[in-house]
Amino acid sequence: MAPNTRASRSRVFRAKNKVSSLILTPLINIPLIRRDDNLADIIVASLQDSRITLEDDDILVLAQKIVSKAEGRAINLVTVTPSARAIELAKQTEKDPRVVELMLQESNEVLRTRPGAIIVEHRLGFVCANAGIDHSNVAGAGDSVEEWVLLLPTDPDRSARKMRDEIQVKTGKRIGILIIDSHGRAWRNGTVGIAIGIAGLPGMVDLRGHPDLFGYTLRVTQIGAADELAAAASLMMGQAAEGTPVIHVRGFPYELREAALNELIRPKEQDLFR
């Protein structure tokens, strides 16, 4: 029997999670998405066009925009009547009061404001700028681009589960789905891709209690694995006019399991930035 040492347990853990490569491939021929489009059908067709055959434990990463568009989350600002509070905040932040009204509707709490930005606790629980509402690459048929904005999906975890289930039925493969968006961070400049909807892969990987390379027991290490993958996929998607909103991932170094976004949201009592 092998000795039950910290070093031997470390070797077992590393071998289990060791990956020769992590491969991210943008899917081709994804059309401009409209309301009520069947994303599962579109993605399966794109996989075929991209000459990718799904395997068990593959992951598909979707840009939030195509999910929101398919779910009808585009809002024409002509239909929005701003409240008194929205009008006041709009003056302070130099924003369109109609957009500010939507931010208030999408948020639990306004945390910070300055000209050009409103920081909120989104109704989904995370902190973000402008409630995740987007003007770019949003248009309605026959209307000015500037009159339309796009809200985040109502329940991104549910959207991810539905997408995962539909694609698994169509392909017979066990996969994960990640829906991502671009967010800033309180302590760094620049936006990065983060997970906002998860199905079939871990949000967090808890390494506490596992040995490190030298056999010492880790005490605090928890990896935001879904956010790490989201950032990698965001590099492939780009932030402007690249038109590659779905990324196929092979070689994710952790076992797939059921999870939800709340794994990644820090409780308020532990949030030192509020």
PLM region descriptions:
Residues R9, F13-R274:
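N-terminal and secondary-structure boundary signal
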